[in-house]
Amino acid sequence: MGDEEVQALVVDNGSGMCKAGFAGDDAPRAVFPSIVGRPRHQGVMVGMGQKDSYVGDEAQSKRGILTLKYPIEHGIVTNWDDMEKIWHHTFYNELRVAPEEHPVLLTEAPLNPKANREKMTQIMFETFNTPAMYVGIQAVLSLYASGRTTGIVLDSGDGVTHSVPIYEGYALPHAILRLDLAGRDLTDYLMKILTERGYSFTTTAEREIVRDIKEKLCYVALDFEQEMATAASSSSLEKSYELPDGQVITIGNERFRCPESLFQPSFLGMESAGIHESTFNAIMKCDVDIRKDLYANTVLSGGTTMYPGIADRMQKEITSLAPSTMKIKIVAPPERKYSVWIGGSILASLSTFQQMWISKQEYDESGPGIVHRKCF
């Protein structure tokens, strides 16, 4: 990369949202749903310019006539044709750039299957003809964004949650814990408990309304039992929400019962450790000498960590699990919704990083396997 003027592109593909923009920027230019929609029925009116597929916000707005699919499930790409459509949309419609003119930094889930990162590499070089590319692990990028190289990242998005211990910039694969419980499950759970209150939300369109209720009104209780008692004895915790049709609904203990399932997955009928235990368990899988550094640098990342009260609750829960003298610090940066992208933006604009790119030439010489040697 002799020409320093070329800005790298940074694309963070999440299960729920795709974040994209230019390296060196402090926030992504484009944030849109990772959805591809196809018409349910053949168009009646000929020449209406009906496309065979829609991506992102356009798919979302036409969701009434489309079947919506998420090509990324639980953080991992499962449908490559649709994924290609999302990347195409990202470059040409959202960022309006020619991918053959810019290096591209992509992100991947921790423990992403090897074949997947090879496929990503192949599509970038062969379909989009990028001059150079790199694949970064999401949690590691979040840690960089917080200005650290050692710590444990609790990254929780729409499709999956990971506890990832990182030492001197390297994720420790043997200690990474994955939890298939994230934003989408919480939205579904809120739909369920609102139904018990007598409000019915069933369709995919209504699910988006519930997601908005979740994002605007939910919070994490410091003491769940005590909060339940408060909610039962007074209406101080109740909030109202106006639906698109003007109807107003009231929501009470659902506000904190919904995110409580992050700490008590049994609420969702799941037999697994909550986010506090998985974080503690991941720390315990690490070498005894580095645990102190992990406890003192526990970084929250991703949209599902945006609930008010979550950092205080994590602090309380981990303090009760850890040795009594241990110093525990939970770091919750305000921009953590986008910290993976921000970390990618920082990394791709470092002068020391420029020799890390996989170039088209290296790819042509070595094939997709090069990604395992250069990105770790």
Swiss-Prot record:
According to its record, what are the GO cellular component terms?
cytoplasm; cytoskeleton
Tell me which UniProt keywords the record has, alphabetically: ATP-binding, Cytoplasm, Cytoskeleton, Hydrolase, Nucleotide-binding
| The enzyme's E.C. designation | 3.6.4.-
Spell out the reaction equation it catalyses: ATP + H2O = ADP + phosphate + H(+)
**GO MF term list:** ATP binding; hydrolase activity
Q: Does the keyword tRNA-binding apply?
A: no
Gene3D superfamilies reported in the protein's UniProt record: 3.30.420.40, Actin, Chain A, domain 4
Subcellular location(s) per record:
Cytoplasm, Cytoskeleton
Q: Which domain of life is it from?
A: Eukaryota
Q: What does this protein do?
A: Actins are highly conserved proteins that are involved in various types of cell motility and are ubiquitously expressed in all eukaryotic cells.
Instruction: Return the similarity comment.
Output: Belongs to the actin family.
What is the name of the protein in this document? Actin
Q: Which organism is it from?
A: Taenia solium (Pork tapeworm)
